[in-house]
Amino acid sequence: MTPVGPAVRGEAPVTLREIRVAFFRNLNLGQARSHSPTSSQLLDAFVEAGARAPSHVGTNGTVVYYHSTGPTLVRRVAKLLTPMCGYHDMVTVRSGSALIELHRRLRGLRDGEVILYDTTPGFDPPTPIESDDGLIVISLDHRRAITQHRLGSRPTAAGPFIASLVGVPTTTRSITTMRRVADRVREYAGA
């Protein structure tokens, strides 16, 4: 058994910064054609990598867990998943505090999408940006974009549009899903 630190063992207090959320791209639990793990394979990989109390929110590769460091653990998880089921795609991680702040930013918005990625700090183009078919990017920085769409329009998917703007792979969740993720983070924090 690999030794783990005190925060992972539950011997230290947990803060919002120790609550992490991993967002996997193109991971749909139990879907073999997308080389996705089952629920138990995914959660077991998190535990084996050193996370404490992982749980997924829905079936789209969103996992909330306790760990004192950020992306290091999810890189280990991704390496464990590759031989297990063939999954090999982008994953990004955010702290619990970042998710609570994002939830505040989503207040009052109708359903749209949140697109997550990692680029160089300082990337902060002016918004709003509107596509020809009615997709409106209302917020965009080096780690995430928030989109809506013009009423009555049927815009293309936000993920590819944002990926073309930021130049890196992205993963997308609906605003409704992100609200559920923030609720799970609050549960983990005991708030």
Predicted features and spans:
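N-terminal amphipathic/basic-hydrophobic helices that include classical n-h-c signal peptides
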Residues: 1-15
